[in-house]
From Swiss-Prot:
Keywords: 4Fe-4S, Cytoplasm, Disulfide bond, Iron, Iron-sulfur, Metal-binding, Methyltransferase, rRNA processing, S-adenosyl-L-methionine, Transferase, tRNA processing. Binds 1 [4Fe-4S] cluster. The cluster is coordinated with 3 cysteines and an exchangeable S-adenosyl-L-methionine. It comes from Mycobacterium tuberculosis (strain ATCC 25618 / H37Rv). S-adenosyl-L-methionine binds at G177, E178, S211, S234, L235, H236, N313. HAMAP family: RNA_methyltr_RlmN. Belongs to the radical SAM superfamily. RlmN family. InterPro entries: Aldolase_TIM, Methyltransferase_A, RNA_MTrfase_RlmN, rRNA_lsu_MTrfase_RlmN/Cfr, rSAM. GO terms for cellular component: cytoplasm; peptidoglycan-based cell wall; plasma membrane. This is Probable dual-specificity RNA methyltransferase RlmN.
Amino acid sequence: MVPELMFDEPRPGRPPRHLADLDAAGRASAVAELGLPAFRAKQLAHQYYGRLIADPRQMTDLPAAVRDRIAGAMFPNLLTASADITCDAGQTRKTLWRAVDGTMFESVLMRYPRRNTVCISSQAGCGMACPFCATGQGGLTRNLSTAEILEQVRAGAAALRDDFGDRLSNVVFMGMGEPLANYARVLAAVQRITARPPSGFGISARAVTVSTVGLAPAIRNLADARLGVTLALSLHAPDDGLRDTLVPVNNRWRISEALDAARYYANVTGRRVSIEYALIRDVNDQPWRADLLGKRLHRVLGPLAHVNLIPLNPTPGSDWDASPKPVEREFVKRVRAKGVSCTVRDTRGREISAACGQLAAVGG
């Protein structure tokens, strides 16, 4: 029996309007509604995206008399950090966020020697029902607004600056949710993540990754948007028989359709596609599956594919676990033998349930 997929949010969220929900025209209109001069729109955007300030009361270049009015109209307190948990000697931090309506979701901030990455959520929960993923097993609560997505980025960037004197370099849509099932808001968020201040955070498009389980039409739409971000396709099996179980959306868009869409993305953007593959002991780690994976990827994507192997992270109630290291090494060897780049991901945050597939927004 195919698990029920949820593409439509069961409880549509209507968080209050925030500056981060608005494009340049929207910001200008909001400022005009407040009876403020037009230049304030650019000034507010610079404070938010450039200086990472989300409270107008701290914006000293604004007249004191209008700060409260601007705060109420354009800077509602969308998210509250309900809990922060760290591991990896403080280099990994998971934040449990509570939205205005009580919805809970998570983001993860990771510091590396040469980069700093925030892993953000696009939905509260997920409707794709992948059996090895805690988020998917919890179901979908609702889509996040553009501002709720961007607030995770701003908070991560501000934490790096204030706590470590460092800068945010990478953003990955690999937290809770299927980003392409919340397409319009994710697209708007990506545009503002990559735009230069005062229109956005100024993160390089090449340092932004959007992950998907394989919503083929949306992958093509993302290609046509020509944002130039990295596409990560969560494949997890090279054959439809197994992928139907591991990634139930495969019952709607087969592997061939997902890979064809990925090839279209690579052709349009010139970007290499990352193929995500959670390696599960005795489930998808057989030598013949490594051979088939390499063969299919080489045929469709050639040098524009990179396999990112992920040792399966434990989740509550699951008997599955990661493949032994010798099996993992053999899998890598066989994929590479087919002419496809393949590496094993450096897993972070496993002990605080912050790693891939572990986010469940519990506690707090």
